[in-house]
């Protein structure tokens, strides 16, 4: 018996490789990259397109383990395995994340505890970080966790896989603009950016996983940024800001 479609996608997104799951009273339909739509009854036409990730994550799928809904997908390749290359089809798998909904049903991500537990060898711990100070001799692969304290107009960046202090371009970058709410993960060739909602008066939690050719960054255990990384192999990092009132506290870097 013919049935009414659950949803008719907007033409602005690709609807291939869907993943469909229910949270509360709403059905979530993940689309080809990191966008999704929500419907509460069949027949929806052109519902609002939302995003649960930002960057290179593609065709993610979810599963339920009895307690949480876990999501993973592939992270795209770039031609010639260079940061400057054109985007290509295919890639490497992401780490598993927990995808969850807030009280309004909006989807967010945080790392599964099992992924955090893999990085159990602490190689650096600092209560306070000096801004604009280059720190080196960290592993190529690690998990960085820190708390940021900013102001209404603060701009702060975390540079990682940084080769040397004098060359900030030879690094990857997580940038946070408190005034606009824009957060980005990028390099000299591209930037994956979105506006995130966060209380500027409260500490901001950042957890960055750097593993092989992948960077996955979680802000406040809610907003996730995903990027393929090839070129930069530096063992340094730094927090950069012109606002000297910015505070970076409770830094921890752990390797596997």
Write out the residue ranges for each language-model feature.
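Short beta-strand segments and strand-loop junctions that repeat across beta-rich extracellular domains
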Residues: 1, 22, 38-40
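Surface loop/turn signatures of beta-propeller and other carbohydrate-active proteins
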Residues: 1-19, 44-60, 116-118, 126
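Hydrophobic core segments of beta-strands in well-ordered, beta-rich domains
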Residues: 5-11, 16-21, 25-33, 69-75, ...
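Loop/turn residues immediately N-terminal
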Residues: 33-36, 213
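Flexible glycine/proline-rich, aromatic-decorated loop/lid segments
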Residues: 35-40, 61
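Beta-rich accessory regions
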Residues: 42-48, 55, 64-73, 77-256
């Amino acid at each position: 018996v013919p049935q009414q479609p659950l949803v008719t996608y907007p033409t602005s997104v690709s609807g291939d490789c869907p993943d469909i799951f229910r949270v509360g009273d709403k059905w979530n339909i993940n689309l080809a990259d990191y966008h999704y739509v929500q419907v509460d009854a069949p027949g929806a036409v052109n519902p609002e397109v939302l995003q649960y990730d930002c960057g290179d994550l593609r065709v993610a799928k979810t599963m339920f383990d009895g307690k949480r809904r876990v999501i993973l997908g592939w992270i795209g390749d770039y031609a010639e395995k260079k940061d400057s290359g054109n985007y290509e089809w295919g890639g490497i798998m992401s780490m598993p994340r927990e995808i969850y909904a807030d009280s309004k049903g909006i989807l967010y991500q945080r790392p599964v505890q099992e992924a955090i537990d893999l990085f159990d060898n602490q190689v650096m711990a600092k209560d306070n970080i000096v801004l604009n100070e280059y720190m080196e001799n960290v592993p190529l692969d690690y998990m960085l966790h820190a708390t940021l304290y900013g102001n209404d107009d603060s701009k702060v960046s975390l540079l990682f896989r940084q080769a040397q202090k004098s060359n900030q371009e030879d690094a990857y970058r997580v940038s946070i603009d408190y005034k606009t709410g824009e957060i980005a993960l990028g390099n000299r060739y591209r930037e994956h950016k979105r506006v995130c909602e966060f209380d500027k008066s409260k500490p901001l939690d950042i957890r960055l996983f750097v593993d092989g050719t992948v960077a996955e960054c979680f802000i406040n255990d809610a907003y996730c940024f995903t990027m393929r990384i090839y070129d930069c192999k530096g063992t340094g990092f730094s927090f950069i800001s012109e606002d000297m009132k910015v505070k970076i506290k409770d830094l921890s870097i752990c390797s596997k």
